Regions:
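Peripheral/terminal regions associated with large enzymatic or DNA-binding modules
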Residues: 1-98, 102-180
Length: 180
């Protein structure tokens, strides 16, 4: 059983959602939080259908225990992550975060878990990312290292700690005037 809590944010990708839920069945997370954002008012028929399918998939997912949250209104991309992680971090000290457009390899979870443990006392490290943007167009590695430090966050399959979340993440960037 996988011990680090996992947060999964879904929207309107039914096929990807199914694939990710299959991965969860294999890794068996001890704690799984699933959030479904609400529909936008201007959704076309196809988007409404995909959103409805995704919601049904989540509602029917019962093979492992999960806390499920469904938003009746669309929160919007800018705020949904902040809203859900603020909720999760009332109960957890760390978490792995996935959206429905990020289908991870199994090793991603072990990598995040190891890095969360390794860097727990390094307060200048805000998060661990499983995003791999460092390949060229030929799919050949641009960098030789297995992982790197970056001052730029990559929010495509990532993990963080409660204290870092509370310190570094602000959707309104209130301290921007002092950082310019």
């Amino acid at each position: 059983m996988y011990k680090t809590p996992i947060v999964f944010l879904t929207y309107k990708r039914p096929e990807e959602t199914k694939k990710i839920l299959e991965i969860f069945l294999k890794i068996k997370p001890k704690k799984l939080y699933i959030f479904q954002d609400g529909q936008k008012l201007d959704f076309n028929k196809n988007e409404k259908n995909k959103h409805t399918q995704t919601t049904k998939i989540i509602r029917n997912f019962s093979k492992i225990k999960a806390k499920k949250f469904f938003f009746s209104k669309n929160i919007c991309q800018k705020y949904i992550g902040f809203k859900i992680l603020n909720k999760v971090f009332k109960h957890e000290n760390k978490a792995i975060i996935l959206e429905d457009d990020c289908i991870p390899e199994y090793g991603f979870f072990k990598f995040c878990d190891l890095m969360l443990k390794k860097y727990v006392s390094r307060k200048n490290i805000a998060h661990i990312s499983g995003c791999n943007l460092y390949y060229g167009t030929s799919k050949k590695k641009i960098i030789k290292e297995d992982y790197l430090y970056s001052k730029y966050p990559h929010f495509m399959g990532w993990a963080t700690w409660k204290d870092r979340w509370n310190k570094y993440y602000d959707p309104n960037i209130k301290d921007w005037p002092s950082k310019k």
